[in-house]
Amino acid sequence: MAFIKTIRAREASGAAHDMYKRQEEHWGYVPNYAKVFSHRPEVMARWGRLLAEIRRPADDRRFELVTFVVARELKHSACSLAHGKQLAGIIGKDNVIAIAEGQEPDVLTAAEVTIMHFARDITRDARKITRGRVEELTKIHGLSEEEVFDIAAIASARVFFTKMLDSLGVEPDNAFMSMDLEFREKVGKGRPISHMRPEFTRDEAA
């Protein structure tokens, strides 16, 4: 469900249908977030290319950490759960829950803790970021300026995506109900998970 009308998966044609098919091939169903892009499928295509390029220089651990921190700060359930799950595969479920609760688990390096706070502050109010904050990353923790750019880009891109989806009332997919209950409740602090069954571009899921 969303606040605007969207094209149902089995009724889509042209570019919208092609976009749905690509999403379905990745997720196994057409995710709710894709449906609001049915009005502008070219935006989804360009967003996908932009995100891929932003992600390319970073390793999975850093990308998922920054993305999760931003999504959790914005209380976006779907992105928090999706990227929290990915991050849990790298650092463990309990550590992801700890981060969600504002802790700094020992599994994180000192640099990663600083990166985490940097990403949170970008999300809260980027105007308050000072040169000193950037120099803490470069001079104390040894990050390159290119790496600082990458972190800022990853965080800012997630702000765009989550705010767009929440502003249009996009509900997290029902598929998230299959996740561990404790993880779901402690990590997914945002819009409630949809009760609607997933849609497919064909009559039945393969």
Feature map (PLM): residue ranges:
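Hydrophobic alpha-helical segments
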Residues: 1-206
